[in-house]
């Protein structure tokens, strides 16, 4: 299992924080997420994902149509996505 740190920008931080889409998408895979926001009131947010089977599975998952729909609903700007793997 892997732990990932992911950063990206969103259109509306409050909408992103309130959305159930993360749990709906990642929960069935056994992946949990802790959310973070930039205290400088920017649109940058971050997550720590635990229980990720492996990076390849995670990357394939977030490139799926279902993930694209969830990201769109959450206002995620996919072009800003940065993923770090625990060393």
For the regions a language model picked out, list residue spans one by one:
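Short S/T/G/P-rich N-terminal loop/turn motif that feeds into the first structured element of a domain
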Residues: 1-87
